[in-house]
């Protein structure tokens, strides 16, 4: 960051083993939550726009209609909980970050 003039950073890195996360909770949270929060803080310090890719697993999957940003979040597994914690840390560390939830 200090040697390059980076304007945008898109975080696509993730622990993606949805089922395996149940037995590797610490690893899932380290990658999906802690690392995302740290990267968001670094981007803020360098005035770099941070864009974080998250997931619809932050919801419980019971809605019969597409989810909206303001819908209640309620992850039902470790993977979803780790991605939700990542979103929280991203916004706590960089309030101008953008989060995109994919499905």
Which ranges hold each PLM region?
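SDR active-site strand-loop-helix element
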Residues: 9-13, 50-55, 60, 100-102
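Catalytic helix-loop patch of NAD(P)-dependent Rossmann-fold dehydrogenases
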Residues: 23, 30, 34-38, 58-100
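NAD(P)H-binding glycine-rich loop region in Rossmannoid oxidoreductase-like domains
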Residues: 1-31
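Ser/Thr-glycine-rich phosphate-binding loops at phosphate-binding pockets of nucleotides
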Residues: 16, 55, 82
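A short helix->loop->beta-strand "cap" motif at the edges of active sites that frequently abuts
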Residues: 45-49
């Amino acid at each position: 960051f200090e040697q390059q003039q980076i304007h945008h950073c898109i975080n696509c890195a993730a622990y993606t083993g949805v089922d395996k996360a149940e037995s590797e909770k610490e690893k899932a949270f380290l990658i999906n939550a802690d690392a995302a929060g740290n990267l968001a803080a670094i981007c803020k310090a360098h005035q770099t726009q941070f864009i974080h890719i998250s997931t619809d697993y932050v919801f419980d999957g019971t809605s019969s209609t597409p989810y909206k940003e303001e819908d209640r979040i309620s992850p039902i597994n470790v993977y979803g909980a780790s991605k939700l914690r990542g979103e929280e840390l991203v916004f706590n560390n960089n309030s101008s970050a953008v989060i995109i939830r994919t499905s």
